[in-house]
Amino acid sequence: MRILIWVISMTAMSVLASSKSDASFQQLSEMKWQYRILLIQDRPDYQQTLTNASAEISDRHLVWFLVSPNQVISNLADSVPEPLQQDIRQRISDKPVVLIGKDGGIKMREERLSLPSIFSTIDSMPMRQAEMNSKLL
């Protein structure tokens, strides 16, 4: 019984020590290998579109940042720190929708938010294929 309690406490401490508070990210690069990132210049209906697809977004380890002139909002945290906002604004340039893979590479740049297209792109990625296969086991 003591061993079981010890294993549970060590596991809990390990998880707490290794997990970073979502609000503490200061740069997009800190999310590498943890999340796929979607940077979006805000349009009136985009937040509702993203909210409606929250299950699919979560399943794909996708974090989105909706950028408007006055703020950046996200599904990751209630507030986005200023250094992270600056990093995000620098990454959105000629295309208002940017998908960044878990490896930190840009996977897609689009004019409009199309979740079916984004999900299809993500689902074709080798890392995503491995994630889906591991769920089946």
Task: Give names to the regions the model predicted.
Residues R2-L137:
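Non-catalytic interaction/Regulatory regions outside core domains
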